[in-house]
Amino acid sequence: MADQAYEPRLKTEYRERIRKSLKDRFGYSNEMQIPKLEKIVINMGVGEAVADSKKIQSAMADLAKIAGQKPVSTKARTSIAGFKLREGMTVGCKVTLRKDRMYEFLDRLITIALPRVKDFRGLKPTSFDGRGNYAMGLKEHIVFPEINYDQIDQIWGMDIIVTTTAKTDDEARELLKEFQFPFVQQ
């Protein structure tokens, strides 16, 4: 048992069940045609960082706890006088998850975080971009179990983008349904 490598639950499920299901449903002739998850990008926009640079450090620390890896800061591309924003100022942070960390995060998102969202009815099945990628937003980062409510100074929102190798939205939707994404029934 000690020499056996750990594999995330969803990765094992993809390899053993989901690949076969998608191959049967879409009739792929080649194993490499079967859609798979490529990466998950988590982005936090911290507009308040313009006035107080300590807020970006707090957001980065929280995002590091959620993702399990160190985020990078995102900088403003252009100056906007109305927001007192200059080009190059730090306005947020993001992290890109791949391989095992991606599957671990997805498991926590589906089984723990989304059910804890207030008034959660399901994810919109129309939030695909036309190329097989899914984008969603969370208003509160405190739905993740890694965040202790008593130790945070502010509640942040985040964008979560799931990038797949699927060519169409229908293929990506079926892939995410197989991963038990809680889509709203149309």
Swiss-Prot record:
One of its GO terms (biological process) is translation. GO terms for cellular component: ribonucleoprotein complex; ribosome. InterPro entries: Ribosomal_uL5, Ribosomal_uL5_bac-type, Ribosomal_uL5_C, Ribosomal_uL5_CS, Ribosomal_uL5_dom_sf, Ribosomal_uL5_N. One of its GO terms (molecular function) is tRNA binding. Keywords: Ribonucleoprotein, Ribosomal protein, RNA-binding, rRNA-binding, tRNA-binding. Pfam families: Ribosomal_L5 (PF00281), Ribosomal_L5_C (PF00673). Belongs to the universal ribosomal protein uL5 family. Part of the 50S ribosomal subunit; part of the 5S rRNA/L5/L18/L25 subcomplex. Contacts the 5S rRNA and the P site tRNA. Forms a bridge to the 30S subunit in the 70S ribosome. This is one of the proteins that bind and probably mediate the attachment of the 5S RNA into the large ribosomal subunit, where it forms part of the central protuberance. In the 70S ribosome it contacts protein S13 of the 30S subunit (bridge B1b), connecting the 2 subunits; this bridge is implicated in subunit movement. Contacts the P site tRNA; the 5S rRNA and some of its associated proteins might help stabilize positioning of ribosome-bound tRNAs. This is Large ribosomal subunit protein uL5. It comes from Phenylobacterium zucineum (strain HLK1). The gene is rplE.
